[in-house]
Amino acid sequence: MPRPLSIACLQTRPMPSIGQAIDEAMPLAEQAIRAGAEFLFLPEYCGGLKSEGSALTPPHAPEAEHPFLAAFQDFAAQKSVWIMVGSIAVSGRDGKIINRGYILDQQGNIHSRYDKIHLFDVQISPTEVYRESARVTAGNAMSLVQTAFAQIGHTICYDLRFPGLYRDLAQAGAEILCTPAAFTKKTGEAHWHILNRARAIENGCFMISACAIGEIAGGGGSYGHSLVINPWGEIIADGGDTPGVVFATVDLDEVAEARGRIPSLSHDQDYTITTVKERGIT
């Protein structure tokens, strides 16, 4: 029988440099460890984020030389703690970057990687436009990760709007679905809680979604409200609109219970689409 897991989301502010991002996150990580957290979860672009017009321009470095990743690998090893580095900007090819997340084990090793599949190319309003693909190369593989505690599905931010990805992860065995994010304030106010609760309910999974909070250098801002949601869709922790640490306890027995009550993951049916046209239309 799995035992309850003490987790913490680090609700950090978007910082314009990697060094500032480390200085922002480390005190929160220390606070989480002092409180007994066994698994830490950081937001999207936790290694730094800024923007230029419609393009996101996070500071980046090659994976093997990335100061933020190295700092948290050392921290994981020193504290013997698992860490999800929600995502950082890793140098890619042709002048582009990769929005890549990691899970680090208790020895500080890279246990898994996930490259964000769905890139944030949207026009929220006439004046709020984002083109993540202008600088970022998309991934093409979902990430299901076996850890010492649970099977975890790692997604990132805009992925949240693509429920098929989450269903595929859940049907492949995920018990916890994670969506580190830097959700915008406007979309966050309208959709963040609803989308996270829906993904938890649809899949009978815990949702752990660490989200950055505050203004982004160059324009825009992130919503905050890091969430932990149980498999019944109930919010058990919400980080609100200030930086800090969000604590929760995750009991995987609740996954089996929710899926036993509503076993929809095993109820998929094949179907066809019948198109009915209005009379007179050819």
What does each model-found stretch correspond to?
Residues 4-16, 21, 41, 100, ...:
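Active-site-proximal beta-strand elements of phosphoester/diester hydrolases
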Residues 113, 212-282:
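C-terminal beta-strand edge segments of enzyme domains
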Residues 63-84, 151, 157-246:
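CN hydrolase (nitrilase-like) catalytic-core segments centered on the catalytic cysteine
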Residues 85-87, 100-103, 143-145, 226-228, ...:
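Short beta-strand scaffold segments in enzyme catalytic cores
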Residues 64, 92-172, 185-187, 194, ...:
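Active-site catalytic loop in hydrolytic enzyme cores
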Residues 12-13, 88, 116-117, 157, ...:
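Active-site beta-loop-alpha junctions enriched in small/polar residues
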Residues 18-107, 113-115, 184-199:
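Cys-nucleophile CN-hydrolase/nitrilase-fold catalytic domain and related Cys-dependent amidase chemistry
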